[in-house]
């Protein structure tokens, strides 16, 4: 008895690969030919396997909640129409049907109270899968059957054969056509070489013959054109960029190596700057603790004195209330004014709000569909099948309505009545008490109705606001009218200046000046004092000019000399002595610090303070007032004018002043080793070299500083003017192009003008030549006509003779 092969069953990995390769070769229409490669599958099964599992457009991810809700609603609207439902959801029909049955089975388990985590659609041992085309492929066994190996080798051979009978026939026809064309071409060439032209017979084509005509051809207008751009320029091939590493791009290993190198450098810099964080990072701690910043709290709103006053008032009200209770006064006025404020009002239970109970809409819809599926015939009558309340809100995703938070309504002296603290109140809603919530602050005990409940108030309506103001004003007026008449009249009379003093005292008592303002005012006072003190100092100190580090007292002349000093010499000695005293005072109180040692320690200055103090004790320094200094300055100015007139000194020009200054400055030399100035003619060669080296170093420092400053300014100007520069370059290029066009147009204009002149001069000559040629041709034609007539006559004569 022959072996009967029943096609079908579980798909294997080898069969899936053969099916995909066959679809790539034969397409999605020749399923019989594709099935001939698979001995155990039919054409229908191959087609189902492709469209239900192997197609790359099939979605195989987990079902989302929105897709499940959409599936249940569409199944309710279009039952059993899975081919229509599938493209709406984005799944296959088999997937939709399978998941729908899965949801129904899950709902049935829920009704039967069988809470199991297993899939209800899972096959039990011994069951056969009715739809193997929608399941993943089974791995291939290590030892295949002979039939499977034969099928695999046959499929490999057939799929690898791309030259079938039809392909060979097409190739042969193509070769014959090419040989026929070459033979005809060779024949035409040989005939053309023999002097015989054969016109090629072309079949008349409908439409445009693209081999003979140029479609959409636009012939250029007659004239002269620039053909410089049409010249072919050979490309300068850069063979360095055609290397393999340039074509392949940067390798991943090279990029990772560069990144690792950057990380090492970054870690090295981090170790130098921030060692603790680098240690934490290298030890494997990814999230190390940050440095805690200093806690900055706002200033207290209530001072200690005010707090003590509140405590005293509370104690006084408590004593008054106890006195009223002991005396037996229990009227409404006393109970209202003297209310209890010690015990916290716990009218609202301290309960944590529980999570609102939510319902599983997918489970409800599945239960409804299962109940509608199992409903009895309506001929029996009775009640309808009980269903859960549902709607079509699950077709689209649900969005939560967000209310705008209102910080104005969350003030500490207002308790909202609708339980929505900090949200915009909705008009027209019923106020609800705050239930099942833990209060966020101490509830207000407002026995005097100072803060009335206004949760229902609509403050956006101006008419309502005006009405509330009018009612409160009327209520206040009625309350004031109800007050008892005063028993005693008092009149307080203030003195005339008491109001101003009272206002000033109130301002001084209430206003507390800020610490920053106090510091700023003190700093301004100190700056003013410093400026005033600086004005009383010497001009050299005020302008921070270089001053000598040592005082040369040998410039003074001895008093007991022969011959004795004159009055002018004595005056000069007094001036020198005062100058030496001023130098000692400045070196003691205002030592000079060179610009290079501003931040560091001053070297060689201020070390002889004891010497200066001793000298100033014997020769005290006298300070003068501002008026005395002004008088002395006026006297000096007058003396300078007298000397200028007496010496006939005119106005000195800047060139002459600079020349004199350069000559004087060239005679002075600074010795860096001794930190002093001396005359150039008294210095040695070594001192001159050291001085010049110091000057060169200073000049280089100035050059470096100015270069850095210039670089910063250049960078800043480049940022500011970069756009303008690029715009200017673009405009300059456009301007140059326009000038070139103008010159070219001018050159063409001159060329055409010259051409017109030549043509105007040549046209008459051409006309004369043409007229002569025509006249000559006419005469020749007449001669030929006469000759033709003679020949005809001679012909007739000969005919008549013979």
From Swiss-Prot:
Substitution effect: residue 411 to A: Abolishes phosphorylation. Markedly diminished pre-mRNA splicing activity. No effect on homodimerization nor on nuclear localization
Annotated segments matching region Required for interaction with CTNNBL1: 200-206
Subcellular compartments: Nucleus; Nucleus speckle; Cytoplasm
GO cellular component term of the entry, any: membrane
Xref: InterPro entries: CDC5L/Cef1 (IPR047242), Cdc5p/Cef1_C (IPR021786), Homeodomain-like_sf (IPR009057), Myb_dom (IPR017930), SANT/Myb (IPR001005), SANT_CDC5L_II (IPR047240)
DNA-binding region listed in the record: 31-54, 82-104
Glycyl lysine isopeptide (Lys-Gly) (interchain with G-Cter in SUMO2) cross-link site: 135, 219, 487
Basic and acidic residues biased stretches: 118-127, 247-262
Stretches assigned to coiled coil: 142-245, 676-701, 764-802
Region (Interaction with PPP1R8): 260-606
Domain HTH myb-type: from-to ranges: 1-56, 57-108
Superkingdom of this protein's organism: Eukaryota
Pfam families to which the protein is assigned, alphabetical: Myb_Cef, Myb_DNA-bind_6
Region called Disordered, residue ranges: 108-143, 247-278, 408-443
Region (Interaction with PLRG1): 706-800
UniProt similarity note: Belongs to the CEF1 family.
Function: DNA-binding protein involved in cell cycle control. May act as a transcription activator. Plays a role in pre-mRNA splicing as core component of precatalytic, catalytic and postcatalytic spliceosomal complexes. Component of the PRP19-CDC5L complex that forms an integral part of the spliceosome and is required for activating pre-mRNA splicing. The PRP19-CDC5L complex may also play a role in the response to DNA damage (DDR). As a component of the minor spliceosome, involved in the splicing of U12-type introns in pre-mRNAs.
Record-linked PANTHER family: CELL DIVISION CYCLE 5-LIKE PROTEIN (PTHR45885:SF1)
Known disease link: A chromosomal aberration involving CDC5L is found in multicystic renal dysplasia. Translocation t(6;19)(p21;q13.1) with USF2.
Protein name in UniProt: Cell division cycle 5-like protein
